[in-house]
């Protein structure tokens, strides 16, 4: 599946330092240690509606990881999926009288446009579930053959009893797991399961639903194994960083990690990064609640994508936050102030700004601190001036390359 057009990256003098990020599994900030090529997987959208700011905030976060790694001299193998077959997609297609394939294609196109406008570096591999059904079913069969899965009325379930490390990502107790599993797409009440926490690997064909031939019979994949199979295929086991929104910690990432351990004997990733939820009207933005601010709608209203990006960068990726009417005016004012400073013929030395932005982003992607460093330079430039004629160009390149904001 094609991704979207890549932004050009302006080279910076020197190189950045190693990236440290908060690892969900250990609860600690850890130094990432990729080799020459870093490997990263981010869970993608289910394309039954346009991308909202919660999605954009997640992919902005992984874009910062990508930029910091590149600045430190690493090539980056970035893989992102799109869940182009799933129950919510089928339900929306039926409710609106649209073929599910057409709905998915339409919303994926809008997503691509949004990501390109926000200057998100595209994945090395942008992979749909539909195009990956064979490798997903093969992984499910591989897990079945280890004895870790069982059949129930033609469906294939992973037996949580066969995953001794289960809980290593989320660190939740069983009661919390059961509650979240039921809220987030699981079926803990299904009769016949060995354990309420057992999860679906392969769903046997149902009348009126799409299905594919496989070694497991005709059907379609369960949710969690889709990402496990795509990540294993494109990144191999034990890659550098796996993640997504914090609502994916459990069950999605916990169950995916168990599937990979079962199939390979090791972890799926060395680090697990999760992004705080963006709220509106006191609730997290979600398609099911309908309390959404769409990136595409903001663009249609004439909002500069650089301003949208700056509004999100003002928030640390791990902290939940609320979108309010004050976000865009504040980001617009910041962009105008920066542009005014960048238009000066000379300004204060920019080398400390580059160093400060690098240091902030390398330490758990502290984008608010990075913005503050540029703010301080711009304020000094506008009030006191400066003598360095090359400073505006270096700050412009710093903001462009590390923060992804083109002014």
Swiss-Prot record:
A motif ('ERGGDP' region) lies at residues 183-188. L-cysteinyl-5'-AMP binds at residues 43-46, 58, 81-83, 223, 245-247, 278. Residues 1-22 are annotated as: Disordered. InterPro entries: Cys-tRNA/MSH_ligase (IPR024909), Mycothiol_ligase_MshC (IPR017812), Rossmann-like_a/b/a_fold (IPR014729), tRNA-synt_1_cat_dom (IPR032678). Keywords: ATP-binding, Ligase, Metal-binding, Nucleotide-binding, Zinc. Coiled coil: none annotated. Its EC number is 6.3.1.13. Binds 1 zinc ion per subunit. Zn(2+) binds at residues 43, 227, 252. Its cofactor is Zn(2+). Pfam families: tRNA-synt_1e (PF01406). GO terms for cellular component: cytosol. It comes from the Bacteria. Monomer. Belongs to the class-I aminoacyl-tRNA synthetase family. MshC subfamily. This is L-cysteine:1D-myo-inositol 2-amino-2-deoxy-alpha-D-glucopyranoside ligase. It comes from Nocardiopsis dassonvillei (strain ATCC 23218 / DSM 43111 / CIP 107115 / JCM 7437 / KCTC 9190 / NBRC 14626 / NCTC 10488 / NRRL B-5397 / IMRU 509) (Actinomadura dassonvillei).
